[in-house]
Regions:
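Minor-groove-contacting beta-hairpin "wing" of winged helix-turn-helix DNA-binding domains
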Residues: 453-460
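A short, conserved structural fragment
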Residues: 438-452
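Basic, amphipathic N-terminal segments
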Residues: 2-304
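Short alpha-helical segments that sit at the start of domains
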Residues: 365-408
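Short, amphipathic alpha-helical interaction segments positioned at domain boundaries
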Residues: 460-484
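Short acidic, hydrophobic short linear motifs in intrinsically disordered regions
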Residues: 407-425
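Transmembrane alpha-helical hairpins and terminal membrane-anchor modules
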Residues: 299-372
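Soluble catalytic regions of membrane-associated enzymes that act on cell-envelope
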Residues: 426-440
């Protein structure tokens, strides 16, 4: 679409983007002997049942704590407990500690200031400035948590709300974008005038770019740079090459998306009537440039100060031109008409453009509520708990399979081989968390280290004997006995 190529560089995700059933069956089919294949499938089930049992108590504590802070029914349950304010605050912090641990285990990351700046440095479908009404958000709960649990690169708004993100995708939209293209042409002309008048530094709305984003002026690939990072192209109208074909024809724009976003916050309240509800909202496939649609307690959008400045300057220039034309000895009616038409046309364009953007905003908000919001509260927490189990099981199975097939390995070699297996068999890339997987294997008792620190596993049959029959297996056998 244009000569400029804008690429966003992001850290590669740790989540394994392969469904567990597909992963297990693919690995099982790589095993030559049918008896070993059967033992491997049995081991996979026992690993999952055991890991699920490990997390059961922690998940139960999490859900019980959330029931006290559920925005819908939590207040009634808290009232029944007859707890003091200090006791409630302790329970709040315990809930957040459990929640943030689950987030980390599910490979969700807190969006940093840098990521937010990169995400919002462009425009996609949402072309209105969206801000949060901070007066409607609590500033105590999260601030207290992060004071006790400091983390690097936290965003400025973390005392009011936290945005977790996981997974990167691509969203494409094809349309004529007539109004947006007109806006783009006007913006370029306005930028040109500012450069002529040496005022671009005062009026420029472009945010400062950080090294995380690489804008390339050619299509040359750089395959040897940052192989471990994920590079995603952003195609925007702002970078479009001006031509009759581009202006009048359909255009495809492209924006990276956050595959999953979870927002945590609490609404503001008074001391006399405190609101203890904690909101946990879950969204999917949110374009980075439109990330504002997931913000809590949004203000109603309006014209920006820059829009008003542009509007007033244009009106003043037009009026000066009209007055100057009238005061001339031979006032030209058509000149006056042309100037007035231009000013009125620009004012009308500004108004209708704003109305169109407002309608788009309302449509996106509705879409985020019905199409892009997966769940909230208890449903989100249950989803997270299952995510943790699925991820841990996949990590353990892949690590054991590599040790079983390729023999002893150092931690670094095991990490590399696991990532290569995922890439070769499934065509996916991820930053494999080998440390966590090895810890689980050692805890299960089916992997050990030799005298020089290399990891090795026991045989499949022995691994099943060490783990032993799980409760789920005993229940299934009992059912089969009752239903011969």
């Amino acid at each position: 679409m244009g000569k400029n190529k804008e690429v966003i560089r992001l850290e590669r995700e740790s989540v394994i983007p392969v469904l567990k059933p597909r992963l297990i069956m693919t690995l099982a089919n790589l095993i030559e002997h049918s008896s070993d294949r059967a033992e491997f499938l049995k081991l996979c089930k026992r690993v999952e049942y055991t890991i699920r049992a490990w997390y059961l108590l922690q998940f139960e504590d999490l859900m019980q704590l959330y029931s006290l802070f559920d925005p819908v029914h939590g207040a009634q349950k808290l009232e029944q407990q007859h707890l003091s304010s200090d006791e409630i605050q302790v329970l709040e912090q315990n809930f957040l500690s459990y929640l943030f641990q689950i987030m980390e285990k599910s490979n969700f990351k807190i969006t940093s200031d840098e990521e937010v700046e990169i995400a919002l440095s462009g425009q996609y479908l949402l072309n209105l400035p969206i801000t949060v009404d901070n007066s409607k958000l609590d500033k105590v709960l999260l601030k207290k948590y992060f004071t006790a649990h400091p983390q690097p690169n936290l965003p400025d708004f973390v005392d009011k709300y936290v945005i977790f993100r996981r997974g990167i995708g691509i969203d494409r939209t094809t349309d004529f974008f007539f109004m947006e293209k007109v806006d783009m042409v006007i913006a370029r002309f306005w930028a040109y005038l500012l450069r002529l008048m040496k005022l671009e530094k005062i009026f420029s709305r472009q945010p400062k770019r950080r090294p995380m984003e690489d804008s390339k002026k050619n299509d040359e690939a750089t395959p040897d740079v940052d192989q471990d990072d994920l590079h995603v192209e952003r195609i925007r109208l702002e970078n479009m090459e001006l031509s009759v074909r581009n202006m009048l024809g359909k255009t495809t724009i492209q924006e990276p998306t956050f595959d999953r976003i979870i927002v945590v916050y609490r609404r503001a309240s008074t001391k006399s009537n405190p609101d203890r509800g904690i909101y946990v909202k879950h969204f999917k496939n949110i374009p980075m440039a439109d990330m504002e649609i997931v913000l809590p307690e949004k203000k109603s959008p309006g014209l920006t100060p820059m829009d008003w400045v542009t509007f007033l300057v244009s009106a003043i220039v037009g009026l000066v031109a009209v007055v100057g034309s009238i005061e001339m000895p031979k006032a030209d009616f058509w000149v006056i008409f042309a100037v007035l038409s231009t000013v009125i046309g620009y004012c009308a364009k500004t108004y209708f453009s704003f109305q169109q953007n407002l309608a788009t905003y309302q449509n996106l908000i509705t879409q985020s509520m019905y199409d892009k919001q997966l769940d909230s509260g208890r449903g989100t927490l249950l989803h997270l708990c299952d995510d943790v189990i699925q991820q841990e099981v996949k990590e353990v199975i892949i690590s054991f399979f590599i040790l079983m097939e390729q023999g002893k390995s150092t931690l670094a070699d095991l990490d590399l081989r696991c990532e290569e297996l995922i890439k070769e068999e499934f065509g996916e890339r991820c930053n494999f968390e080998v440390d966590d997987a090895v810890q689980k294997l050692e805890k299960l008792g089916i992997v050990s280290r030799d005298t020089i620190g290399r990891y090795f596993c026991v045989g499949l049959k022995r691994a099943n004997e060490i783990i032993g029959a799980t409760t789920e297996e005993l229940v299934l056998k009992a059912r089969q006995g009752l239903n011969p």
